[in-house]
């Protein structure tokens, strides 16, 4: 366990002509990877982190990638049990467990919209089986569609893509193999973050948000000028911002500030006495009579939706060459002699293209039958159009999802799914499927596409980790299917639990992406139309941003996720910049940065898991919170700010504290 283990010098740079990357585990040897230990722990991680990610995603609209915390737990357990040669096993644990965040993102960005619209249309009904099938089938399609692109992203483009999350996870696994004291900072941070978020969610000792309305002039500014500042003070969201990093968090927050501080006040000035209800007859207030939050929900967020859709289209155009080459490679292999080329190194063996082709056809057929009998109530035409839309869009957007993970470590599936929903709704209405039945069908279709893209993007991270360390891709690919099915079952259960406990229509669960999906699909399916002008403005903004090489997707995401959830991302990103740049010694900065990643992972895992515990307590009728009466008092927000500053202080101080035996 303590043998000399370091990644090769050329692990993170482009290879020179004729140079070959040699992974940590030799391609010529066989190592323990898939066994009872790794599969059991992988399934446990998938269940635990699916529940945690579902709660966090529905509460604040952000889903963390579970790869890093799962890798740390895998390392901690293998170290505690003194398992030898556990590196390959830990990669499998991480790969199976990481299905959690990916499947959750796919499910919760779309399927809760069914519950949200159910309040308005009681005829719309869903079940555990529908949620499970949409998530499971989408996840399986995502894995099958991504495998042909593995070699391009992880091997051909070696050193050209940063793979931020894969890098962090790989470093954790390597550090564990060295025998360092990796788990301690994570456990302490998990306890701190978990206790902090539990106090807010279950006890209500301080407000979960700090806003400018805490003072009198702030209330006046919000009422008259429609200007407001808000920040969620939770530990989990702060940790998320740290892992995302300053650059991506900055552009996301910038998009949010443009909407909240320019567009929202600007609309109030320009249309102060107007009722803008052309695409939503339920709007009866003048713009001037609305709060900033109401203007955002009714109008400004639609600009972000248009921006996300256009950024997705630009992504497909940029990826067209990759798609063509991968399809060509798959066609060549299908015409080849055998399933497995014995000359291919262990570290380059994939599931054969024949199995992928057969698996894809069977999965598409099962999805078609699910649509035909489970969603479209036996209408063959609707089912055929639905499966064609889902299969083509999921395949085309697979490279966009993988590209996003490879560059920024964050998968913009919500934007791509919004575009899918808009397109699918227009097509389904054209063939005669409207009203609540059409909404349900389009949302289930969106759930399948969203999960496919989310799992595909996440899986490229796992495969890059395996490439750096020297595991067998075929084993990662095969066991990823099991993790996907387990995660799909877990997220279905958690989603139904949270709906019973809080209710998606109550406002207690932010679920911003699902609310956006509901807002888009309702007018489209009722023939009212949609805010095409606002979508168009967003699309133009995305084109202009792309021209100036500004990440349009990050900016547009910020435009439609609420301000209070974007500001803490910037705070976390700023902490990342601060702790990794204060020393003149690059090695010290690097050590602090990695320590910060462990602490942020602890905040995320601890905060999210306690969120699930809080939901279970509430569901069981155990209520000890003083929030209902206390949170209306501005002092609850003052307490929130003080607690947040102390939390940030702990974070920064903990990164500078040198652990005994800490060996990054």
Give, region by region, the residue ranges found by the protein language model:
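Alpha-helical multipass membrane-protein architecture
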Residues: 1-664
